[in-house]
């Protein structure tokens, strides 16, 4: 069984989760993946660990994770891989970031136990894809 998990940033406002949820619904309708779920980086539930644990419990053997972010950043390069257990958690001292200390609540307390035989595949964010360019041009025209 294959699961697709879309990761959103999350927000104190409802829009981030709503958009990721709508994208997930549209993907579900295509019937490509057995399971399609969303997980939120911060502020909202389901958290990333909640979602991953849920799809594992539902029998997913291959979990494809796509961050619904435009660009790589600290979240996609460090925080999410740490939550997924793909890289070690390090004490992050933001050297060279001008004392930029922001302590997010990243649900680090929750653990993901990945059983034997379950594969987690973590993909890149959207990037400057031509389809993103088309959307920007549509928005510029007021469409």
Curated annotation (Swiss-Prot):
InterPro entries: CbiX-like, SiroHydchlorin_Cochelatase, Sirohydro_Cobaltochel/CbiX. Keywords: Cobalamin biosynthesis, Cobalt, Lyase, Metal-binding, Methanogenesis, Nickel. The active site is at 9 (proton acceptor). It comes from the Archaea. Co(2+) binds at residues 9, 75. Ni(2+) binds at residues 9, 75. It catalyses: Co-sirohydrochlorin + 2 H(+) = sirohydrochlorin + Co(2+); Ni-sirohydrochlorin + 2 H(+) = sirohydrochlorin + Ni(2+). GO terms for molecular function: cobalt ion binding; nickel cation binding; sirohydrochlorin cobaltochelatase activity. Pathway: Cofactor biosynthesis; adenosylcobalamin biosynthesis; cob(II)yrinate a,c-diamide from sirohydrochlorin (anaerobic route): step 1/10. Pfam families: CbiX. One of its GO terms (biological process) is anaerobic cobalamin biosynthetic process. Its EC number is 4.99.1.3, 4.99.1.11. The keyword Ubl conjugation does not apply. It is an enzyme of class 4 (lyase). Substrate binds at residues 45, 70-75. PANTHER family: SIROHYDROCHLORIN FERROCHELATASE, CHLOROPLASTIC. Belongs to the CbiX family. CbiXS subfamily. Homotetramer; dimer of dimers. Catalyzes the insertion of Co(2+) into sirohydrochlorin as part of the anaerobic pathway to cobalamin biosynthesis. Involved in the biosynthesis of the unique nickel-containing tetrapyrrole coenzyme F430, the prosthetic group of methyl-coenzyme M reductase (MCR), which plays a key role in methanogenesis and anaerobic methane oxidation. Catalyzes the insertion of Ni(2+) into sirohydrochlorin to yield Ni-sirohydrochlorin. This is Sirohydrochlorin cobaltochelatase. It comes from Methanococcus aeolicus (strain ATCC BAA-1280 / DSM 17508 / OCM 812 / Nankai-3).
């Amino acid at each position: 069984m294959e699961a697709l998990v879309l990761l959103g940033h999350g927000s104190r406002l409802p829009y981030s989760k709503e958009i990721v949820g709508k994208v997930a619904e549209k993907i579900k309708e295509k019937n490509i993946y057995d399971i399609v779920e969303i997980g939120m980086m911060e502020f909202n539930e389901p958290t990333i660990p909640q979602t991953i644990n849920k799809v594992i419990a539902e029998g997913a053997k291959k979990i494809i994770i796509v961050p619904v972010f435009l660009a790589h950043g600290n979240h996609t390069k460090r925080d999410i891989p740490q939550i997924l257990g793909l890289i070690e958690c390090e004490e992050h001292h933001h050297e060279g970031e001008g004392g930029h200390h922001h302590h997010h609540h990243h649900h680090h307390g929750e653990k993901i136990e990945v059983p034997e035989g379950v594969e987690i595949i973590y993909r890149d964010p959207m990037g400057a894809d031509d389809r993103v360019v088309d959307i920007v041009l549509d928005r510029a025209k007021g469409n």
